[in-house]
Amino acid sequence: GMAWARQFSQPTLYVAGNHEFYGSDLVSTMASLRTEAQGSQVRVLERDEWRHGGVRFLACTLWSDYRLFDSPEQRDEGLQKAQEFVRDFSRIGLTPDFPDRFTPAVSQMLFDQSVAWLEARFGEPFDGPTVVVTHFAPSPGSIAPQFVGSPLNACFVSNLEAQILRWQPCLWLHGHVHHSCDYLVGATRVVANPRGYAPKGEVENTQFAPNLLIEF
């Protein structure tokens, strides 16, 4: 979490994932993260742009849109499984003043707002490489082979490949999945390098590269 991120002396970009919000709400969690990052090299980004060394970074959580599947039947099954198995909808609130819980509808609304924000940013001229950083995955290419066809994939992945082919950032970094990814959507390299869970000190993702360095 933030204590880990604060120990780095280099600029560190922090994009909240779903677990950051557990036991709290969307508004309070973001405010707390920004407060905790003060006085450090950590930049907490949510629909925020940051430029460094001639590179433009665009970052947002990018909650799932639950439109991954084409057929209504598959979408309905995905929503049913999500509400049955995903803890986001029981452990995340919306604001500190109301008891309303996070829902797939709110997730989709936030997704659409984030995509509109990205569209606006890519509509602005920038003479240099652009890196997008999200928590949730932007392409079915990030689905692990053993989970292909699972209705729960809608909770992890949205399909922004058409937009990526138009925008063509040089790099898209994401989290949420528990396996490593490195593939291309057009000229955009999509990379995930998660540690995964670490029960009893063991790293879930054996392909995790703690010193991964990406050059572009």
Positions of predicted regions on the chain:
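Metal-dependent catalytic neighborhoods of phosphoester/phosphodiester hydrolases
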Residues: G1-S9, N18-G39, H52, L68-D70, ...
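Active-site neighborhood of phospho(di)ester-bond hydrolases with catalytic His/Asp-centered motifs
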Residues: L13-N18, R43-R47, V131-T134, I164, ...
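Short, solvent-exposed loop/turn segments at secondary-structure junctions
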Residues: E20, W50-R51, L62-D65, F136-P140, ...
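Soluble or luminal CAZymes and related metallo-dependent hydrolases
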Residues: D25-T29, V106-W117, L152-F156
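Metallo-beta-lactamase
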Residues: T35-G53, F57-A59
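A structural motif corresponding to the C-terminal end of an alpha-helix
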Residues: A37-V42, W117-P129, A162-C170
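Binuclear metal-dependent phosphoesterase catalytic core
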Residues: R51, A144, S150-C170, H178-F216
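Active-site-proximal loop/helix segment associated with metal-binding centers of metalloenzymes
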Residues: L58-V131, F136-F147
